[in-house]
């Protein structure tokens, strides 16, 4: 689960991580009032959306007086920001972070992520802050320094100091930088984060080390023990179809194609998308109904797929292990009747009770195309969609 920058900074502040003073504003008047309360000569107005690249898209402005605060707030609030992370549809800006400006001397990058290869948290840092870390990793990987953290003992002071020296933090500020990284790590662990990214971390003319931006992503499976974090969820920033899918324990991710996919198991779902692409089709979604699908689940999955107006056909690809093929067949028939499906539907069943499942489909009287294999099903749906 993602949260907004201003929320992330509030979380970090509670762990002793230094961040600029700021206030969130939902209207132009609130933005002006927030700037007055901050009482600073220069303030920064930042669009609050769940996406990076806001500065390049015009979502970050520096205001030097209250008139500029008002002008920038009027120009940003209610507009749709399109960045490299939002997709072409962009995201509407419904809130601003009004933050005090600071005298930036140098920008750095600091982040914590899970490293699956070592099953450890890794602290990454670079003196190339303010730019996309992926870009730095691709062009100048030698500028990224890493410390792998033993989960039994946590981040050690010597590791944080080594990172600070490697990225050339001024020696008089190393102590502050170490405190910053230790606080960031505590927040990461105690709040069950999957990502904690500070880009940029800055040193200032006043001799401070602070986070000018904060991206925190939380493990959705751990939210049951973090009610305070769950309350920060902004449903307006999430895809409505993904929200609906989560209510039925369906894993749904929208894509840009026109062939809806309903599959059980993440691996089979990815293989299904691959084989559709292989036969020159374009999947419209990733949808994993899981191992315990019921007729109700299948019906809801159909409804979610069909809520995408780009979908021109559906491919159901089920391997019945825990799940029985006859249950899926009944669910497909029920869903087809309920939604009044008029689009081409190809169904491939394999596994437990497969013959019974096929019999149920064949005797349904509905226009359902049976497939003997995954490749056969992919070719048929691509052909039917045209």
From Swiss-Prot:
Positions of Mg(2+) binding: 199, 213
CC terms in the record's Gene Ontology section: cytosol; succinate-CoA ligase complex
Residue span(s) of domain ATP-grasp: 9-244
Residues reported in the UniProt entry to bind ATP: 46, 53-55, 99, 102, 107
Residues binding substrate, per UniProt: 264, 321-323
Catalytic activity: succinate + ATP + CoA = succinyl-CoA + ADP + phosphate; GTP + succinate + CoA = succinyl-CoA + GDP + phosphate
Disulfides per UniProt: none
EC number: 6.2.1.5
Pathway named in the protein's UniProt entry: Carbohydrate metabolism; tricarboxylic acid cycle; succinate from succinyl-CoA (ligase route): step 1/1
ATP-binding keyword on record: yes
Co-factor(s): Mg(2+)
Any one GO biological process: tricarboxylic acid cycle
GO MF terms held by the record: ATP binding; magnesium ion binding; succinate-CoA ligase (ADP-forming) activity; succinate-CoA ligase (GDP-forming) activity
Keywords attached to this entry: ATP-binding, Ligase, Magnesium, Metal-binding, Nucleotide-binding, Tricarboxylic acid cycle
Cofactor binding mode and count: Binds 1 Mg(2+) ion per subunit.
Matching Pfam families: ATP-grasp_2, Ligase_CoA
Role this protein plays: Succinyl-CoA synthetase functions in the citric acid cycle (TCA), coupling the hydrolysis of succinyl-CoA to the synthesis of either ATP or GTP and thus represents the only step of substrate-level phosphorylation in the TCA. The beta subunit provides nucleotide specificity of the enzyme and binds the substrate succinate, while the binding sites for coenzyme A and phosphate are found in the alpha subunit.
PANTHER family for this protein: SUCCINATE--COA LIGASE [GDP-FORMING] SUBUNIT BETA, MITOCHONDRIAL, SUCCINYL-COA SYNTHETASE BETA CHAIN
Family: Belongs to the succinate/malate CoA ligase beta subunit family.
Record note on quaternary structure: Heterotetramer of two alpha and two beta subunits.
The protein's name: Succinate--CoA ligase [ADP-forming] subunit beta
Species name: Bacillus cereus (strain ATCC 14579 / DSM 31 / CCUG 7414 / JCM 2152 / NBRC 15305 / NCIMB 9373 / NCTC 2599 / NRRL B-3711)
